[in-house]
């Protein structure tokens, strides 16, 4: 064998040795990563068990609690609660929508069931009625039930233990989603709803004051939550921008989608355009999502798709062309 061949063989052996060392290192690295992941999982389980031992609480078996909240009133929060709950039920998910606004009951009006209210949320909490007596089956969509708020009871009647009891019963009844229509701001009902949230939909208008108040809500989301007490992942917050008017954004009379996202720094769930159809639907007791011809109804349907993890293009964020603009090729 020539010296040249010998050198080649030596180089080949060295290369194979280096490859083996690298492969061994990669295997060791993968095992370390796997062990770290297992340790992390074990720590989470231990943390949950410790939390359960300390608080006497445990996670719900099935339900996901979605709280629709806002920093101020008049942003379309109850309209959004009704639309999102209806949309989830339309997708085949057993859904309950709960009105946490004790003393200012409105959800039943938008859902069109105000004349069918016999018992309410507080009646159930105070053992004056059973949950299945108070739940109202929606007349539009299967799989959807409404639990109205009380118009007459003291807001302090909404207790943590009472809400826990109701949610636990809904969990036992195989509900998948519970949508909570929270009062605006940080009063008792709002804080109670936020405490039980798995996800929070922060509803805001594209106005500075509305966005500022929403920022306060985001700030308190994880300050005291059931999830943190149970050692679970933090509450997920998503942005729902309502009453959006692209022409006003263009004139700098309104914040743009990007402006609001920059200020609140939470993922965007949807943009709902300003529409007279919303008021018409609410007055008729029909959630706007049922109006499949309206832009607002379509936008809420898109938001529900995103809530379920589906990718949907963002619509209704640019100004629509008028007839003459289209004819003349303007308004691009």
Regions found by a protein language model. Name each.
Residues 2-18, 23-35, 40, 44-57, ...:
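C-terminal lobe/tail of nucleotide-utilizing enzymes
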Residues 65-128:
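Walker A/P-loop NTP-binding active-site region of P-loop NTPases
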Residues 118, 132, 160, 164, ...:
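Amphipathic alpha-helical transducer elements in NTP-driven molecular machines
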Residues 96, 145, 179, 238-240:
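A structural signal for isolated positions on well-ordered beta-strands in alpha/beta enzyme cores
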Residues 63-67, 176-179:
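Residue-level preference for the first positions of well-ordered beta-strands
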Residues 57-63:
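Phosphate-binding P-loop
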Residues 100-172, 282-283:
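P-loop/Walker-type NTP enzyme "switch/lid" segment
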């Amino acid at each position: 064998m020539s010296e040249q061949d010998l050198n080649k063989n030596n180089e080949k052996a060295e290369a194979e040795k280096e490859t083996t060392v690298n492969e061994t290192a990669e295997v060791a690295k993968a095992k370390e990563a796997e062990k770290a992941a297992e340790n992390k999982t074990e720590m989470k389980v231990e943390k949950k068990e410790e939390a359960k031992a300390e608080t006497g609480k445990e996670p719900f078996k099935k339900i996901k609690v979605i709280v629709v909240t806002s920093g101020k009133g008049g942003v379309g929060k109850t309209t959004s609660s009704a639309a999102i709950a209806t949309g989830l039920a339309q997708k085949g998910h057993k859904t309950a929508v709960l009105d946490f606004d004790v003393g200012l009951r409105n959800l039943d009006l938008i859902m069109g069931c105000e004349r069918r209210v016999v018992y309410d949320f507080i009646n159930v909490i105070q053992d004056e009625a059973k949950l299945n007596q108070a739940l109202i089956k929606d007349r539009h969509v299967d799989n959807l039930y409404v639990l109205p708020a009380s118009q007459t009871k003291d807001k302090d009647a909404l207790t943590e233990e009472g809400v826990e009891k109701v949610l636990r019963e809904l969990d036992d009844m195989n509900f998948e989603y519970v949508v909570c229509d929270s009062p605006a701001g940080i009063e008792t009902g709002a804080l109670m709803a936020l405490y039980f949230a798995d996800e929070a939909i922060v509803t805001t208008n594209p106005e500075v004051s509305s966005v500022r108040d929403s920022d306060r809500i985001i700030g308190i989301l994880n300050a005291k939550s059931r999830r943190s007490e149970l050692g679970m992942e933090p509450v997920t917050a998503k942005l729902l921008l309502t009453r959006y008017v692209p022409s006003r954004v263009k004139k700098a009379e309104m914040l743009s989608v990007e402006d609001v996202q920059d200020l609140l720094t939470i993922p965007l769930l949807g943009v709902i355009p300003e529409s007279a159809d919303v008021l018409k639907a609410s007055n008729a007791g029909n959630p706007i999502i049922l109006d499949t011809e309206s832009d607002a109804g379509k936008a809420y349907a898109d938001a529900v798709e995103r809530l379920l993890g589906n990718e949907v293009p963002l619509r209704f964020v640019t100004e629509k062309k008028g007839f003459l603009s289209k004819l003349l090729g303007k308004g691009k």
